[in-house]
């Protein structure tokens, strides 16, 4: 009889604890990434002109490439691995020099660059400091809110870049991209390491974006959803 009473008391305590946990858990706890891409200023109608672009390393990557991009276009660079797509983005962004050719940016063009290797992140910095140093005018509360929108809450913001996963580094890079308010986004494999829901959220943000986008992706679904 006493044993049965003890079992009932234990079960009652478990139910009470379960009820407390359910009550204490925030109802609106964020489980999805939130990103809004908004250019601060409008560029001229002619955003990018590429003429006669060529590049070789041990072998020829590409030669005599010409293309133009107008304001508001969302352009995907597609092709086989090793054909120089990422190199084209780096040349446009001034990271790599071309062997030949001309790159001309239009008036009032401001570039926001997403690097698939996340080399723009300092591995020794915390997530908080990575944002704070890039945008020194942001208050601590704003930085925390931005990081929370990308699913970094509480003590997560004090983790070092070197200690987080590839997908998490991608979210930090996207947070910095969002804060740039650039009007010309250059994105190198932006969906790599993102979960399905985050990919869909990024798709929606790009489709709503009023600026111009040039990106490399192997994600056919993403390309079909976003490229103009």
PLM feature segments, named:
Residues 1-34, 38, 99-100, 136-138, ...:
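Extended, highly charged alpha-helical segments
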Residues 35-228:
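ABC ATP-binding cassette signature C-motif
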């Amino acid at each position: 009889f006493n044993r049965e009473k003890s079992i009932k008391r234990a079960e009652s305590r478990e139910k009470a604890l379960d009820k407390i946990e359910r009550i204490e858990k925030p109802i609106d706890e964020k489980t999805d990434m939130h990103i809004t891409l908004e250019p601060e200023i409008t560029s001229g109608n002619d955003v990018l002109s590429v003429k006669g672009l060529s590049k070789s390393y041990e072998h020829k990557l590409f030669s005599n490439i010409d293309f133009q991009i107008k304001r508001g276009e969302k352009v995907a660079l597609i092709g086989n691995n090793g054909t120089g797509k990422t190199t084209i983005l780096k040349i446009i962004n001034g990271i790599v020099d071309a062997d030949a050719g001309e790159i001309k940016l239009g008036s009032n063009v401001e570039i926001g660059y997403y690097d698939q290797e996340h080399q723009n992140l300092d591995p020794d910095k915390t997530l908080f400091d990575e944002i704070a140093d890039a945008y020194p005018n942001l208050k601590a509360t704003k930085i925390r809110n931005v990081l929370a929108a990308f699913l970094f809450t509480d003590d997560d913001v004090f983790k070092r870049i070197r200690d987080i996963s590839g997908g998490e580094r991608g979210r930090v890079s996207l947070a910095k991209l969002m804060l740039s308010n650039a009007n010309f986004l250059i994105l190198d494999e932006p969906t790599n390491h993102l979960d399905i829901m985050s990919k869909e959220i990024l798709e929606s943000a790009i489709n709503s974006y009023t600026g111009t986008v040039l990106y490399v992706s192997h994600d056919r679904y993403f390309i079909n959803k976003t490229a103009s």
